[in-house]
Design a protein with these regions (language model features):
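Compact structured core domains
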Residues: 167-170, 177-188
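Polybasic (Lys/Arg-rich)
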Residues: 164-167, 201
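Short conserved micro-motifs at the rims of enzyme active sites and ligand-binding pockets
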Residues: 136-137, 171-175, 222
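Accessory alpha/beta interaction modules
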Residues: 1-158, 168
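Intrinsically disordered, low-complexity linker/assembly segments
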Residues: 157, 162-165, 177
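Generic recognition of short, well-ordered alpha-helical interface segments
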Residues: 26-30, 93, 173-176, 198-205, ...
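Short, charged alpha-helical interaction segments and adjacent helix-coil junctions
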Residues: 2-8, 82-87, 183-290
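Short intrinsically disordered coil segments
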Residues: 101, 139-145, 175-181, 226-227
Length: 290
């Protein structure tokens, strides 16, 4: 129905494709469905009904910066800011990065003369293709809470992290709207995608939109450039991880060698003490014979 070779060849976690799919005015209903799926943890409730894009265009200058993040930013009818992005490679800083994005978007709301009470909630959503947090749940949400009774300070901070690999490791059919979107983003097989499309018309719309993606040479060019960058980044991260592992092992071996050297030194010291003891005893025996 919707699934063809061009669809299966696409990496939906490519940030250029993600923004192309979800960052367009005519495909806003798709984005709203994905956002609501995250905010309601998969229920069918729609708490966000409108979304005004703050950056609708794919800026060519931004695209030239290989390390630029092609996120989607907008606000709801009540002024709530929402930022959503995908991350493929683990840079080991996603917690700091998302907190920085949140703080930047939150602080830039105020104009000169406005009150702090005019600040609106800011929501950041990060869909990650790697595991990061020490828990089995694939969806983590962070707010500002009181240390002992866990009462929220307010509702202005919401950081959502979706760890795709943790969901994939469950090896089950989607149980709700959020999991159907995760199946779509995780590039699963055609049969599963068609089932998800039949159950969610917005996923069907996304698959239909993909058919047109490769028809524009400019879009395909930037998609390929981002893919190359992601591959290079993955290769660099793998090399760094390997070097760090080797350094850690070398440090461990050096520590063990140092420990062994210390033990050998202590044994030598004990052996010398024993030798001195026997030498003294031998000299005493000689003196007694005299």
């Amino acid at each position: 129905m919707f699934v063809g070779s061009i669809i299966m060849a696409l990496n939906r976690l490519n940030d250029y494709l993600f923004k192309w799919l979800f960052g367009q005015e005519d495909r806003k209903p798709m984005l709203l469905d994905l956002i609501n799926a995250v905010l309601t943890d998969g229920s069918d409730e729609n708490i966000i009904v409108d979304f005004e894009f703050k950056d609708r265009e794919l800026d060519p200058q931004k695209l030239k910066d290989k390390e630029a993040t092609l996120d989607i930013l907008g606000k709801t009818s009540d002024g709530t800011l929402i930022n959503i992005e995908v991350q493929v490679e683990n840079q080991h800083d996603i917690d700091h990065r998302m907190l920085y994005y949140w703080a930047k978007n939150y602080s830039l709301q105020l104009m000169s003369g406005e009150e702090y009470t005019d600040l609106k909630p800011t929501i950041c959503i990060c869909i990650m293709n790697f595991n990061y947090f020490p828990r089995d749940r694939y969806h983590s949400c962070y707010n500002v809470l009181e240390r002992l009774d866990h009462q929220p300070l307010n509702n202005d901070m919401n950081l959502h992290f979706i760890e795709l690999k943790k969901w994939a490791d469950l090896k089950r059919k989607p149980l709700n709207r959020l999991e159907r979107w995760l199946l779509y983003l995780a590039n699963n097989n055609p049969k599963e995608l068609e089932e998800a499309a039949y159950e969610n018309r917005y996923i069907a719309s996304a698959l239909a939109a993909e058919v047109n993606f490769g028809l524009d040479d400019n879009d395909r060019y930037w998609y390929d450039m981002r893919e190359k960058f992601l591959m290079d980044q993955g290769s660099i991260n793998a090399k760094v991880a390997r070097v760090e592992k080797e350094a850690k092992e070398a440090k461990k071996e050096a520590k063990e060698a140092k420990k062994e050297a210390k033990e050998a030194k202590n044994k030598l010291k004990e052996a010398k003490a024993e030798a001195e003891k026997f030498k003294a005893l031998y000299e005493q025996l000689l003196n007694n014979k005299k």
